[in-house]
Amino acid sequence: MKAIRQITDEDGKPVVAGTYHVPVLLKESVDGLAIRPDGTYVDVTFGGGGHSREILSRLGEGGRLFSFDQDADAERNITDTGSRFTFVRSNFRYLENWMRYYGVEHIDGLLADLGVSSHHLDDGSRGFSFRFDSPLDMRMNKRSGTTAADILDSYDEARLADVIYMYGELRQSRRIAAAVVKARREAPLVTTGDLLKVAEPFMTRGREKKDMARLFQALRIEVNHETDALREMLASAARLLRPGGRLSVITYHSIEDRIEIGQRRGSCGAGLLRPQTHAVPSGRLPSDGAF
């Protein structure tokens, strides 16, 4: 398993993953898969398709690539419709079910780029960023039910505070949750502007943008059940990867790091993962191994 912890910019903001034009850590992550021309590979975060195109460029006629994305927007980025490539519009938590559906028992490698793409952050209609006054949606899959507005309107104060603390790592989580519950008694919070107005007084002085980004991160993770999906996908990958197969994961925050590390340790204990050491570029935390 090759896990690469992304470095941050001068403001401490993670470099955005999976932009629809320039994939993050393209060479490092695909090199980590040690592509076999006739192998079977999975890209569970297709996004703009950059990582998938690089994998396909290294596959021969006998190779296969399955690429997952639950967002319908990603389908616009498909450029290869040949027999080697299969696009699966689904959450990657269902990886094992889909591989069974396609008759695939084992894979040679899997790549996961866990960051939010600039496409989502720059789309003012999706509610992923506080830069726009837009509906509090935050669903990666627009066909799914619960939105961020639903969570803010229905969770009790304790549950909402737990979400903000666990997934946003904000010490002021209980004060923010109390303010949300108080505000929604007057009117529901339905736009990012509504949330900003309620939460801004509780942001740390000098860290307002960073704290607000963490608040939005917490809601996004809860809306999309990201931690559960990640655990399920990694467990499935451990079962699907053949001996010597590779898992290359790009993480962007400590929550993803902890899940990846925990899953890797569990796989080591079960005899599914053999740790290896590889050099990675300065500024990134190395965590490598092979199944």
At which residue positions do the language-model features occur?
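S-adenosyl-L-methionine-dependent methyltransferase catalytic core, i.e., the SAM/SAH-binding region
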Residues: 1-291
